[in-house]
């Protein structure tokens, strides 16, 4: 299905054309279309006739979009039950439980509610909680040109809001127990639902909210912090759509905004031939895993966080560059939030809006990482060139070897680096040191670590290890608590 964003223009390109179009459209009187219990939808500003979305079109009707609510619960984890706000009897006859939290999962462009990742997310939730998990299917409204799909989000959001209202008025179910999780365009669907419910929804999670037709627009058009009591956002594809094909927003739109790996290029999503030659108007469903890898990482990170609550700690920092240069370590006294499912456990989650956090993840498969600062003081007879590596050994497991430094190795000098460990080793009991210079040396020099200090990111706790030994290259040296 082509992704045609010609109706969604960007301030950074074709500014003059956009301004002229916007000026022309401003002279045209706004109109609206009404869809029964969902109310009326205007095609005037700010919904249309703006620089970012000059096309004055309407969202499709509810009948054309055909939004469906697919309910999964702990009692029916494999087969959904369809519930309808216009027929409350379907809710009463289902496994929907009033004493549980309800989490809606909302797909984005060219996706569908029966896609595997939505059910996978539900099933992970069932492993840790009793929950009503509703997959929102609006594929008939999402599998069209992108511009039309972006306008259709308003009707889907209205449908969700109406269902939540029915649950509240007919069954006494509080909107505070509702969590809306939206990917891409689904993030803005969630925002529209939250806006219609006047921000009384308990939580909205935006998974790489879509940029085209939304970034830079007024709050009522896009996801923003006022749409729920708590809004958290994961940005994974925030590079500009022109020329980098970044589909996600770089704009901060939540109380907590997480930028894993800097928010632009995710590990395991390196550029390939297909993603470099594909045109913005020619992305079809069969190639989305190639061309939109970064964009899809957001829901994969969230799903992984459900069963790995401690492996996605976000560090407050003003930029990814400062984060990478060790300027934002360890977590402050009030702690760091957990990106993903457990972000709402952070005590300062709504202290202010647009709080910014950075972290690193793994590539495909094991995304979780635990951050440490490692300080190595060397010992030896003379200066050498090469690299040094350290492995952590704890009560929960052992890490692989991580490079701390490469270059000139000076005895008595100290080398410091932050590392992102792929295993939660727990309380560190010992460390192992190794050095190598990849050069044949007949004198077989030795070097060692006299002291290694490891500081844990989550709480700043330090572990100190010492040794008086030196070792030949490629020979492991064990250090124990001083």
UniProtKB/Swiss-Prot annotation:
Key words of the record: Calcium, Cell projection, Cytoplasmic vesicle, Disulfide bond, Glycoprotein, Hydrolase, Lipid degradation, Lipid metabolism, Membrane, Metal-binding, Secreted, Signal
Disulphide bridges: 34-40, 122-133, 269-293, 317-328, 331-336, 466-482
One GO CC term, this protein: zymogen granule membrane
Record keyword Aminoacyl-tRNA synthetase present: no
Enzyme Commission designation: 3.1.1.26, 3.1.1.3
Entry's localization field: Secreted; Zymogen granule membrane; Cell projection, Neuron projection
Pathway(s) annotated for this protein in UniProt: Glycerolipid metabolism; triacylglycerol degradation; Glycolipid metabolism
Enzyme class of the recorded protein, top EC level: hydrolase
SUPFAM superfamilies given in the database record: alpha/beta-Hydrolases, Lipase/lipooxygenase domain (PLAT/LH2 domain)
Residue ranges constituting the PLAT domain according to the UniProt record: 370-482
Disruption outcome: Suckling mutant mice show inefficient fat digestion associated with fat malabsorption and decreased rates of weight gain.
Ligand binding (Ca(2+)): 219, 222, 224, 227
Signal sequence, start to end: 1-30
InterPro entries per UniProt: AB_hydrolase_fold, Lipase, Lipase_LIPH, Lipase_N, Lipase_panc, PLAT/LH2_dom, PLAT/LH2_dom_sf, TAG_lipase
CDD domains per the UniProt record, alphabetical: Pancreat_lipase_like, PLAT_PL
Known tissue expression: Expressed in acinar cells of pancreas (at protein level).
Induction trigger: Up-regulated in CD8-positive T cells by IL4/interleukin-4.
GO molecular function: calcium ion binding; galactolipase activity; monoacylglycerol lipase activity; phospholipase activity; triacylglycerol lipase activity
Active site: 184, 208, 295
Main function: Lipase that primarily hydrolyzes triglycerides and galactosylglycerides. In neonates, may play a major role in pancreatic digestion of dietary fats such as milk fat globules enriched in long-chain triglycerides. Hydrolyzes short-, medium- and long-chain fatty acyls in triglycerides without apparent positional specificity. Can completely deacylate triacylglycerols. When the liver matures and bile salt synthesis increases, likely functions mainly as a galactolipase and monoacylglycerol lipase.
Record family assignment: Belongs to the AB hydrolase superfamily. Lipase family.
Protein name: Pancreatic lipase-related protein 2
Source organism per UniProt: Mus musculus (Mouse)
Gene, per the UniProt record: Pnliprp2
């Amino acid at each position: 299905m082509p992704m045609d964003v010609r109706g969604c223009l960007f301030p950074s390109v074709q500014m003059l054309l956009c301004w002229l179009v916007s000026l022309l459209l401003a002279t045209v009187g706004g109109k609206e279309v009404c869809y029964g219990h969902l109310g009326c939808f205007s095609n005037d500003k700010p919904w249309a006739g703006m620089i970012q979305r000059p096309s004055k079109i309407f969202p499709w009707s509810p009948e054309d979009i055909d939004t469906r609510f697919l309910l999964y619960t702990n009692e029916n984890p494999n087969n959904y039950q369809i519930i309808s706000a216009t027929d409350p009897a379907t809710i009463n006859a289902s496994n929907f439980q009033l004493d549980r939290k309800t989490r809606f999962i909302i797909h984005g462009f060219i996706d569908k509610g029966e896609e595997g990742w939505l059910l996978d997310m539900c099933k992970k939730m069932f492993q840790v909680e009793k929950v009503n998990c509703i997959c929102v299917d609006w594929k008939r409204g999402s599998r069209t040109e992108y511009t039309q799909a972006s306008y259709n989000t308003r009707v889907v959001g209205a449908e969700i809001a109406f269902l939540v209202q029915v649950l509240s008025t007919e069954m006494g179910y509080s909107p505070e127990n509702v969590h809306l999780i939206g990917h891409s365009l689904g993030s803005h669907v969630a925002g529209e639902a939250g806006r219609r419910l006047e921000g009384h929804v308990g939580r909205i999670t935006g998974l790489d909210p879509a940029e085209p037709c939304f970034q830079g627009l007024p709050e009522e058009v896009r996801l923003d912090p006022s749409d729920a009591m708590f809004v958290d956002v994961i940005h994974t594809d925030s590079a500009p759509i022109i020329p980098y094909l970044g589909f996600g927003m770089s704009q901060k739109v939540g109380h907590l905004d997480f930028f894993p790996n800097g928010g632009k290029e995710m590990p395991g999503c390196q550029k390939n031939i297909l993603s470099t030659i594909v045109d913005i108007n020619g992305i079809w469903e069969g190639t989305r895993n190639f061309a939109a890898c970064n964009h899809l990482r957001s829901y994969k990170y969230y799903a992984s966080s459900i069963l790995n609550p401690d492996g996605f700690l976000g560090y407050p920092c003003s930029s990814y560059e400062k984060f990478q240069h060790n300027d934002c370590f360890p977590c402050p006294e009030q702690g760091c939030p957990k990106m993903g499912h457990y972000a709402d456990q952070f005590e300062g989650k709504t202290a202010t809006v647009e709080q910014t956090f950075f972290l690193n993840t793994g590539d495909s498969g094991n995304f979780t990482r635990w951050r440490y600062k490692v300080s190595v003081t060397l010992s030896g007879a003379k200066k050498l060139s090469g690299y040094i590596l350290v492995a952590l050994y704890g009560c929960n497991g052992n890490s692989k070897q991580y490079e701390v430094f490469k270059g000139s190795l000076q005895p008595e000098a100290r080398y410091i680096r932050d590392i992102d460990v792929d295993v939660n080793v727990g309380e560190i009991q010992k460390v192992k040191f190794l050095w190598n210079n990849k050069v044949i040396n007949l004198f077989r020099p030795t070097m060692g670590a006299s002291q290694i200090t490891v500081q844990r990111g989550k709480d700043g706790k330090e572990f100190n290890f010492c040794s008086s030994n030196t070792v030949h290259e490629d020979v492991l040296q064990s250090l124990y608590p001083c």
